[in-house]
A protein has these predicted regions:
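Hydrophobic alpha-helical connector segments
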Residues: 49-81, 132
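Short, amphipathic alpha-helix enriched in basic
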Residues: 1-20
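Tryptophan-centric aromatic hotspots in well-structured domains and transmembrane helices
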Residues: 29-30, 98, 102, 141-142
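Key DNA-contact positions within bacterial/archaeal DNA-binding proteins
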Residues: 24
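HTH DNA-binding helix-turn interface
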Residues: 3-7, 27-37
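Amphipathic alpha-helical packing segments from all-alpha helical-bundle domains
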Residues: 75, 79-82, 92-119
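C-terminal peripheral helix-coil segments that are non-catalytic and often amphipathic
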Residues: 63, 69, 104, 108, ...
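Short, basic, alpha-helical segments at the C-terminal edge of helix-turn-helix-like DNA-binding modules
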Residues: 41-47
Length: 174
């Protein structure tokens, strides 16, 4: 339904009608549309491929960019995130869940990638984890909101280049 209608047009009533259950059944599990969609996003993020060692910082950053783009800028993400972010921002409990799951899990994954790069001698430390995550997510959201027609492959390359720039003191690959 989300892919068909998008986040803004999705309603609890519509979900109940389509699934053949009472609206109260849905509200017993989720207090709002945003919570219901958040759980769907958690499920979707579980289906993303793991961040395996690609053998280089550049390869690992490309893998991170691919995951972020798949989640946020894939067909479903483009239909969810623009409306979801606004609703979530007005719900402190949901924002806390978002921070404690997607944000912290992402930060832990990025830390592991940067630790591998330190072991390979490509980076001196892992201090840029929070900055890197902010650039990755912020850039993808900005591009999804303001460049909605951008091809996923081009977006992934842009995000990987921005990530490399963060870690290399602002220099982008030639």
């Amino acid at each position: 339904m989300l892919e068909e209608l998008g986040y803004q047009a999705l309603t609890i009533e519509g979900v109940a009608a389509r699934s053949g259950v009472a609206k109260t059944s849905i509200y017993r599990r989720w207090q709002s549309k945003a919570e219901m969609v958040f759980d769907l996003m958690l499920h979707s993020s579980d289906e993303l491929p793991p961040l395996e060692d690609r053998g280089s910082l550049s390869g690992d950053l490309d893998a991170i960019a691919a995951r972020v783009v798949a989640l946020v800028a894939g067909p479903l993400g483009r239909r969810i995130f623009p409306g979801f972010i606004g609703d979530a921002a007005g719900d402190p409990a949901l924002m806390e869940r978002l921070r404690n799951t997607i944000v912290l899990d992402g930060r832990n994954q990025i830390t592991r990638v940067l630790e591998r790069s330190v072991r390979r001698g490509e980076l001196a430390d892992t201090e840029a984890v929070a900055d890197l995550q902010a650039v990755l997510i912020g850039a993808v959201l900005m591009l999804v909101l303001f460049e909605p027609e951008m091809d996923e492959g081009l977006l992934r390359n842009k995000i990987a280049d921005l990530a490399m720039a963060v870690l290399s003191g602002g220099r982008t690959p030639s």
